[in-house]
Structures are given as C-alpha cells and as structure tokens.
C-alpha cells in the first residue's frame, strides 16, 4: 500500500511540475490591446452599418447579430446608452433579459455587439483572436457613444476582461 501511495504521489508531483512548466514556458498568442476603431465608419445610420457588417457572414445564428434596440424613435440619441458585451463562446442572449430591463429602466438605447467568431460555427471561433475582440470592443463602445450621451457597460466573462482592458486606454474611454 505504501508503495502505491509513494508512486501516486510522485506521479502527481511530476504532472504538477509538467503542467506548471507548460503554463510558464508554453506557446502564447501575441495580443495587441491597442486595436482601435474609427468611429467615422459608423456613418449616420448605425443600423445600416451593423447590417452591412453582419451581412459579410452567412452563418450567423439568427437573433445574435450586432444591433441597437432603440428606446424610442429609431435614430434618436438618448441621454444614456447601455452596451452589452458577452462572454467567451456566448452571444447577446447570454443573460437576456437583464440588459433589456436595465436599458428600459434608464430609458436608454441598447447596443448588443457580437465578438468575432461568436454566434457562428466552431471553425469561425477558432479563427478569432484576442486582438479581434479588442477591436470589436472599441467598435461597440463607439456605437454606444453614437446612440447615447453617456454609456453604461454591462459585460460578462471575457466581455468584462475586454472592457477592463479598454478602460486602461484613454482613447476608448
């Protein structure tokens, strides 16, 4: 029995050291957190901009596209806008109806973004990078500013990480 425990302990130790070395020395993706977005690309019609951007992909799951839920008349800016940025492998539907209820309570326009690769096939997810998602965050913040004087951001999981990284950049806040 002692021999079995001894070998089990050694195996666990070797595995821990191996995984630790892999985590420290393993390959890492280069992440460019400086990715930005030119807000002038949004133009005067944000709905049209989002439709054109999302039309580039034929495999987006219905209902998870980038979009604005207008508090009142379409195209009318509100004092506050709410932006929802979802988590990894999720979509705008992740915590609904929470963003809708917050926006409704504030009388705010609501912007839903879709991070690159999300709401599509597994292959599309595999091609996305953290830099792509940082650009998506910059685009979403610009869109939220275009439809509201101030922006309330709701984010979950990876969305929260992206917003935290964006908060460190004066050009995005």
Where on the chain are the PLM-derived regions?
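Short, surface-exposed "cap/lid" segments of acyl-processing enzymes
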Residues: 61-115
